[in-house]
Amino acid sequence: MTHDISETPTAPVSRYYTAPDGLKLHVLDWSGPSDAIPVVCLPGLARTAADFSALATRLARTRRVLALDYRGRGLSQWDADWKNYSLAVENADILAVFTAMGVDRATIVGTSRGGLHAMLLSATRPTLLHAVVLNDIGPAIEARGMARIRGYVGKLPAPKSWADAADLARFTMGEQFSGLDAADFEAYARLTFEEKKGVFSTRYDPALLKTLEGLDLSAPLPTMWPQFEGLRDIPTLVIRGANSDLLSAETVDEMARRHPSLEAYVVPGQGHAPLLLDTPSIERVAAFVEGN
């Protein structure tokens, strides 16, 4: 399933910027033609900029692509106060990175939490948004999906080898990702874990779990319909994993009703959130980006 990225135009450059409160933030920067609107990729809750490597390689044929590690994830600095792993603080970080990198307009590709940030930007800085891709996220989130995520974030055992890591990925995500094969789960594991001197760990601060512990999943979760409606005049593509337990088909239908020009794409055999590693998904996103 994984996309061939052998045609990499350039390897990404790691850049570091300072958040408003002084924390170090990491950004991957794929150089590309400067005459096109750049793409900024925002990952999921416990994910990193590296998730977008295959997609960014493809998009960098026609434009610059940036991917951000939120604080406490990837190569960004961990925060001593877990309460700062919040949408509000992260959104301020994103705006600071935009300013530092001289980006005044971009297409946002947001996976899960990254899509929430895209919707928030429609309220906090709408002029930044040229187009938006929402990867398995919408204004309404299913509680059962959040319950599943809360069941593993910050709780994964440390694998002993890459083969063990792939098995753990399959155990954790196999039901959601019924269309993946052994090589796909190994690729996913390598994006989830890091290995230093034989010791494996996740690529995020385990304190992220604390941000989920207080969620009342017995009641409907707060929605973001007003923020989504801020995208009404902005070209928007929503991607849904066919097996997703976080973004329902009914929510996508309602999104289309409120955003008449919304484009939708379903990834078969994948759940929350589609990995954007397969050629059809990558080319669908590329067609949207390059068409806007």
Whereabouts are the PLM-identified features?
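Catalytic histidine-centered segment of alpha/beta-hydrolase-like enzymes
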Residues: Q270-T279
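Conserved alpha/beta-hydrolase catalytic His-Asp/Glu region
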Residues: K160-G214
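Conserved serine/cysteine hydrolase catalytic core
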Residues: K196-R257
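Active-site loop/oxyanion-hole signature of alpha/beta-hydrolase fold enzymes
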Residues: P20, S53-T57, A67-V109
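Alpha/beta-hydrolase fold catalytic core
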Residues: M1-V39, R61-T62, V103-D104, P280, ...
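Conserved HGGG/HGGXW glycine-rich cap/lid loop of the alpha/beta-hydrolase fold
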Residues: L23-W78
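Short beta-to-alpha linker loops that shape the active-site pocket of alpha/beta-hydrolase fold enzymes
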Residues: D69-R73, G138, P268-G271
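Conserved hydrolase catalytic core segment
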Residues: D104-A143
